[in-house]
Amino acid sequence: MGMEGCCSNKKVMEEEALVKKITGLAAAIGELPSLSPSPEVNALFTELVTSCIPPSTVDVDALGPDAQEMRARLIRLCADAEGHLEAHYSDLLAAHDNPLDHLTLFPYFNNYIKLSQLEHGLLARHVPGPAPARVAFLGSGPLPLSSLVLAARHLPDASFDNYDISGEANERASRLVRADADAGARMAFRTADVADVTTELEGYDVVFLAALVGMAAEEKARLVEHLGRHMAPGAALVVRSAHGARGFLYPVVDPEEIRRGGFEVLTVHHPEDEVINSVIIARKAAAPPPVAADRDVPVNMPMPAQCAVAVSRPCLGCACELGARAHQKMKEIAMEEMEA
């Protein structure tokens, strides 16, 4: 057997071992009497996340039926556990005079700082221009750390509308900002199903779609199509996804579904550190260009969006000079290929 065959067999064995381990953890988590924070719950989810974070060649979309069923069940369990965890810490924070002074009590707060830095860096690079004035976050939950970090560290002049289907989650979230004059003035919490939000979407410069809003691929595709119908042309969409084994924790979003929803996909970024979510930056397509009277082709037809999308991995936050040079080189290569 050649070297290539040995490597292939090793990869298959590693993937099978990983799926087997995650299947066992999913079974153990499914047998827990409660997903509220406890030593047992925390230990199992810590082991699960630790198993899924390292770079992996596993393709969750290519799993067999049993593994796919396990994965779908596990993502729902992760969503429930995340909701319990956020509600628990939201209540703890609300007991303080100014909850926003104590956000570091949340054990994964640093992950949100890094994810928000990454998302803002990608937005600034791929959607240049004035800073967003109005931002919507869809699926903000009882502990809206993403909005809070973005507002405090990256978008100090923007207003944020946070949408969640749960009125209880929004009540918890609103308690956190009441004592802070700045956040209280810029943060609004709206209880609604995303599919029912229509005309309001026209007013946002950026819309963030949380990873767990639309957990099934078909549901996510419908939501993206809904956003494509109602967002303003030129507005940015930030979609959280997952890659590799991290797809056992969160849904994987196909960039092609975002294109079909009426968006130009600008970049896809897969972190390889403790930031679990991949990030897709897209922009609502402008209205079709006018058709010249004496020709059968549109005037100033833009190049198809799918030709120039860059899929990138760290540098985190896209802030370092090396990352910037590499990204520019990717763009130059893409343009050369399109012109060839």
Curated annotation (Swiss-Prot):
InterPro entries registered for this protein in UniProt: Nicotian_synth, SAM-dependent_MTases_sf
Pfam family, one: NAS
Conditions for induction: Fivefold increase after iron deficiency.
Taxonomy, superkingdom: Eukaryota
BP-aspect Gene Ontology terms: nicotianamine biosynthetic process
Keywords: S-adenosyl-L-methionine, Transferase
Enzyme class, UniProt record, top EC level: transferase
UniProt GO MF annotations: nicotianamine synthase activity
EC number: 2.5.1.43
Catalysis: reaction(s): 3 S-adenosyl-L-methionine = nicotianamine + 3 S-methyl-5'-thioadenosine + 3 H(+)
PROSITE patterns membership: NAS
Function: Synthesizes nicotianamine, a polyamine that is the first intermediate in the synthesis of the phytosiderophores of the mugineic acid type found in gramineae which serves as a sensor for the physiological iron status within the plant, and/or might be involved in the transport of iron.
Similarity annotation: Belongs to the nicotianamine synthase (NAS)-like family.
Quaternary data: Homotrimer.
Protein name: Nicotianamine synthase 9
Gene: NAS9
